[in-house]
């Protein structure tokens, strides 16, 4: 509620419907959600339509972020990125592409699935 504007992109249509319903039920009017593939939606045109953001929270699928999405993020020079990942290997690959523009300032692994090999890893990146 305190943010000026929140834009959500989700690949699962049902999750977008649920998010829109939740926002409506909670009288939150500063959000907009779009369903689709991030690499197709997150473009210069998308950014010009929605404006430049001061924070990106990304939680890509196991394959990680598409290189075109990373290129758009680098062009934006968003001050902070919170990168949540269920695959530390692809997260590491993506962070390698971001390292010239962003510093890793915090890392927090989270064991959401005890007694399995799965771990969520959260990284805070800040613009250099």
Kindly give the residue locations of the regions a language model identified.
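Rossmann-like S-adenosyl-L-methionine
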Residues: 1-128
């Amino acid at each position: 509620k305190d943010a000026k504007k929140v834009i959500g992109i989700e690949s699962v249509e049902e999750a977008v419907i649920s998010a829109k319903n939740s926002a409506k039920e909670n009288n939150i009017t500063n959000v907009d959600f779009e369903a689709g593939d991030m690499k197709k939606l997150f473009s210069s045109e998308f950014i010009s339509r929605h404006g430049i953001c001061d924070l990106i929270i990304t939680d890509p699928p196991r394959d990680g972020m598409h290189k075109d999405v990373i290129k758009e993020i680098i062009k934006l020079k968003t001050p902070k990125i919170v990168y949540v990942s269920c695959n530390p290997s692809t997260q590491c690959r993506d962070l390698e592409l971001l390292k010239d523009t962003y510093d890793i300032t915090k890392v927090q692994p989270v064991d959401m699935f005890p007694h399995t090999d799965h771990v969520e890893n959260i990284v805070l990146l800040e613009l250099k």
